[in-house]
């Protein structure tokens, strides 16, 4: 592997550039495990590896909202530490990190569920988990550029002029997507459709905003199909742009309903 690291993004090259990029999990552990199995990964020594040398990448927002948040976090921590996986920062990942730092954050939008699971652990286990999460988070970045910058992975958004750069403004777009600076009645940022104007060279895979299906728009694709709302957990297999999905219908009882699609090629 060749790597050039610049502050909070990474440029990576591997002998074999084969990736399985997973959308927003949000605590849906059962669906994550089903998807990992369907992708052909095999468990060995506590980690999942692929017989063809494929690598897992998370677009972020692994926890919050679902019912098995710590299990999802633990899976990705192990995969990053020992399984050759990568995990770009999502806004929920960043919020949990700030919570662990001791910053004042609102226990809302699903974080309260993750914290409740943490609080149920014995103090020693809680502190060990905190340390493992923080070390893992600090080892990762806000966006990845892969395979000679052919492919980019980010959580919220990445404008063409930001590729290969980093700043506080770029950081905000990576976490939240492009916004107007205003907030809606629920306190969430009003979003702009940055993908509709994207004209960059890298193919950008992202999540954050729930989309009914993984539709390719201007060399971008949103693979958050709202599994935690009863939609789908999506994986994008690269190269080739093949989508594989697992349904999250059972989650409709706990969260607002959403819809998605089935396995597709794009």
Roles of regions detected by a PLM:
Residues 50-53, 65-145, 149, 160, ...:
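Active-site neighborhood of divalent metal-dependent phosphoester bond hydrolases
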Residues 24, 61, 90-91, 114, ...:
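Divalent metal-coordination and catalytic microenvironments
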Residues 152-170:
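Divalent-metal (often Zn2+) His-rich catalytic cores of metallo-beta-lactamase-fold enzymes
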Residues 14-20, 145-152:
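Beta-strand-turn-beta hairpins that frame and shape the catalytic cleft
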Residues 27-30, 64-67, 93-97, 160-161, ...:
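Active-site environment of divalent metal-dependent phosphoester hydrolases
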Residues 2, 13-14, 172, 176-266:
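Acidic, His/Gly-rich catalytic cores of divalent-metal-dependent hydrolytic chemistry
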Residues 21, 56-58, 87-88, 152, ...:
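Residue-level marker for buried hydrophobic side chains located in beta-strands
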Residues 1-73:
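N-terminal active-site segment of His-dependent metallophosphoesterases
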């Amino acid at each position: 592997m060749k790597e050039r690291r610049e502050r909070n993004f990474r440029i990576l090259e591997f002998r074999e550039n084969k990736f399985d990029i997973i959308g927003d999990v949000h605590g849906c552990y059962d669906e994550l495990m089903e998807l990992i199995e369907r992708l052909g990964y095999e468990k060995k020594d506590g980690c999942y590896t692929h017989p063809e040398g494929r690598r897992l990448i998370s677009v972020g927002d692994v926890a919050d909202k679902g019912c098995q948040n710590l299990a999802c976090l633990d899976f990705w921590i192990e995969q990053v530490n020992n399984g050759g996986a990568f995990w770009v920062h999502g806004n929920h990942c960043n919020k949990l990190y700030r919570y662990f730092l001791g910053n004042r954050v609102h226990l809302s939008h699903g974080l309260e569920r993750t914290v409740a699971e943490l609080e149920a652990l014995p103090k020693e286990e809680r502190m060990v988990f905190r340390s493992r999460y923080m070390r893992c988070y600090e080892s990762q970045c806000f966006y990845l550029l892969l395979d000679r910058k052919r492919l980019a992975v980010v959580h919220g958004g990445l404008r063409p002029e930001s590729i290969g750069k980093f700043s506080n403004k770029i950081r905000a777009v990576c976490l939240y997507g492009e916004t107007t600076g205003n907030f809606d009645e629920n306190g969430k940022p009003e979003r702009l459709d940055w993908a509709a104007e994207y004209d960059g060279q890298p193919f950008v895979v992202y999540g954050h905003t729930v989309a009914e299906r993984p539709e390719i728009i201007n060399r971008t694709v949103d693979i958050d199909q709202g599994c935690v709302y009863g939609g789908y957990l999506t994986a994008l297999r690269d190269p080739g742009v093949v989508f594989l999905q697992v349904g999250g219908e059972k989650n409709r009882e706990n969260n607002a309903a959403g819809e998605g699609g089935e396995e597709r090629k794009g």
